[in-house]
């Protein structure tokens, strides 16, 4: 279990590397907006959470945010958001609630006790464009 930002396996497929790059772009953008990135690629059981972060607000008070990052280079097969279906959402929620119930990140790092929400952020490359869906599910 690893939640450290730079600790990704070396044997990644090209698609996985593109996903990693998209997650890095999103993490950078959120950090520039004042968010704290607590962990990337967090494994809880068999499921993975792309980003675990804190949105400091305003307008809302600080929240723990589980971010699902999606990369899509074309809309020919629909919107990237549409790939986060019921099953994927259930897996993300289950993993997040297990982590929250444990009160810590899987690597033992602290997890702030804040209200939680689930966001989807879509990255469209060349040049990078972002669509941020807050409280998406």
What do these predicted ranges mean?
Residues 122-137:
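Short, low-complexity, polybasic intrinsically disordered segments
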Residues 2, 6, 71-126:
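Catalytic cores of nucleic-acid endonucleases
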Residues 47, 63-65, 116-119, 131:
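Protein kinase-like catalytic core scaffold
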Residues 44-48, 127:
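Short acidic/glycine-enriched loop/turn segments that link adjacent beta-strands
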Residues 1-40:
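Acidic-basic catalytic patches of nuclease active cores, encompassing PD-(D/E)XK
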Residues 30, 49-80, 92:
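Conserved catalytic cores of phosphodiester-cleaving nucleases, focusing on short active-site segments
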Residues 41-45, 110-112:
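A short beta-turn/loop motif at secondary-structure boundaries
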